[in-house]
């Protein structure tokens, strides 16, 4: 039995979707449970060359043997959820989905408030998905819960009970975090943050798992960090620099161009300490050095690629166990058992 949490180490968009999908295939968890804020964070999953952009369904959905869960701490937009279940019909997502009956519900009024609030939309760079206003209502105890919405009633259940029973029975469980540690309401660059905490301890609480049940925390870092929206970015490079390196990205949810920077070892060290990270996953190493593209054995990485990994381990103090060298799941180096 192993309970693993995957957390973003930067400002989101680190490639958690790829790492989560890989772990779900390799480790075959019984339940894949989603923590985090809500549908404000998007993940892109590539399966057999086809890309899926999702915001509610756990990104481990390609593992058709696992139950998929959305924890009580996660805000749920029924409209988004039902569209994704339909889109992923060939993966039998609807038959495997458990939405906690206590989850908070985003309604149209929350999205309207989010988009019309000038402070949130222009100064902070909110995604406009209604999460902030919904969390306000939750704090005021006026927010609807999953059990109050008929359209999702067939998917409702007790996620905490399901996850804990799976762990007690000796099964693997994977908890998906969303966004990144540096967007945490508590520990990020306030006020340019999201509407709740985005660290491992909170993700465990979101799905109803106690801290002593967590075995592994995988912090995911991209070889070059990116950020959507406003806020400090200590190692940010110019648009011209990013384009010269061939690094041009757009957000999954907002479609806004991502700001790009250089890897920040000091911030990475703080993030790993904050999350109690036991492992690091590095994504997009092939963007740092295209000679690393598609490599699946550590020994075959370029010297430049190896030097990057070594520097991360030495300066951050946590072992790099997973390295992504391309978008496909097979383009992954896994040294966890070496």
UniProtKB/Swiss-Prot annotation:
Binds 1 Mg(2+) ion per subunit. InterPro entries: Adenylosuccin_syn_GTP-bd (IPR018220), Adenylosuccinate_synth_dom1 (IPR042109), Adenylosuccinate_synth_dom2 (IPR042110), Adenylosuccinate_synth_dom3 (IPR042111), Adenylosuccinate_synthetase (IPR001114), P-loop_NTPase (IPR027417). The active site is at 13 (proton acceptor), 43 (proton donor). It comes from the Archaea. SUPFAM superfamilies: P-loop containing nucleoside triphosphate hydrolases. IMP binds at residues 13-16, 40-43, 127, 141, 179, 194, 256. Its EC number is 6.3.4.4. Disulfide bonds: none annotated. SMART domains: Adenylsucc_synt. Keywords: Cytoplasm, GTP-binding, Ligase, Magnesium, Metal-binding, Nucleotide-binding, Purine biosynthesis. One of its GO terms (molecular function) is magnesium ion binding. It is found in: Cytoplasm. Pathway: Purine metabolism; AMP biosynthesis via de novo pathway; AMP from IMP: step 1/2. Its main location: cytoplasm. GO terms for biological process: 'de novo' AMP biosynthetic process; IMP metabolic process. It holds the Pfam family Adenylsucc_synt. One of its GO terms (cellular component) is cytoplasm. GTP binds at residues 12-18, 42-44, 258, 284-286, 324-326. Mg(2+) binds at residues 13, 42. Belongs to the adenylosuccinate synthetase family. Homodimer. NCBIfam families: PRK04293.1 (NF003295). This is Adenylosuccinate synthetase. The lineage of its organism: Archaea, Methanobacteriati, Methanobacteriota, Methanomada group, Methanococci.
């Amino acid at each position: 039995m192993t309970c693993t949490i995957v957390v973003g180490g930067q400002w989101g968009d680190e490639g958690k979707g790829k790492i989560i999908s890989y772990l779900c295939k390799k480790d075959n968890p019984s339940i894949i449970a989603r923590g985090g804020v809500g549908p404000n964070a998007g993940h892109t999953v590539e399966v057999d060359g086809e890309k899926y952009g999702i915001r509610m369904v756990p990104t481990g959905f390609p593992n058709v043997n696992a139950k998929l869960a959305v924890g009580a701490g996660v805000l749920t937009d029924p409209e988004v959820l039902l569209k994704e279940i339909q889109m992923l019909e060939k993966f039998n997502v609807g038959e495997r989905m458990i939405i906690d009956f206590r989850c908070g519900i985003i309604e149209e009024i929350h999205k309207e408030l989010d988009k019309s609030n000038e402070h949130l939309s222009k100064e902070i760079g909110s995604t406009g998905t209604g999460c902030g206003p919904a969390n306000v209502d939750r704090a005021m105890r006026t927010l609807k819960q999953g059990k109050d919405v008929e359209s999702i009633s067939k998917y409702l259940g007790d996620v905490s009970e399901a996850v804990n029973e799976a762990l007690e029975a000796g099964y693997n469980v994977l908890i998906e975090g969303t966004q990144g540690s540096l967007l945490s309401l508590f520990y990020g660059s306030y006020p340019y943050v999201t509407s709740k905490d985005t660290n491992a301890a909170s993700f465990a609480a979101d799905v109803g798992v106690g801290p002593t049940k967590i075995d592994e925390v995988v912090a995911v870092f991209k070889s070059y960090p990116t950020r959507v929206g406003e806020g400090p970015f200590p190692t940010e490079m110019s648009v011209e620099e990013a384009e010269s390196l061939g690094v041009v990205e757009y957000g999954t949810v907002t479609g806004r161009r991502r700001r790009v920077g250089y890897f920040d070892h000091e911030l990475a060290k703080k993030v790993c300490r904050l999350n109690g990270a036991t492992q690091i996953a590095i994504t997009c190493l092939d963007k740092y050095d295209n000679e690393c593209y598609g490599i699946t054995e550590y020994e075959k990485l370029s010297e430049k690629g190896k030097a990057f990994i070594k520097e991360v381990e030495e300066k951050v103090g946590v072992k790099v166990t997973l390295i992504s060298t391309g978008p496909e799941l097979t383009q992954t180096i896994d040294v966890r058992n070496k």
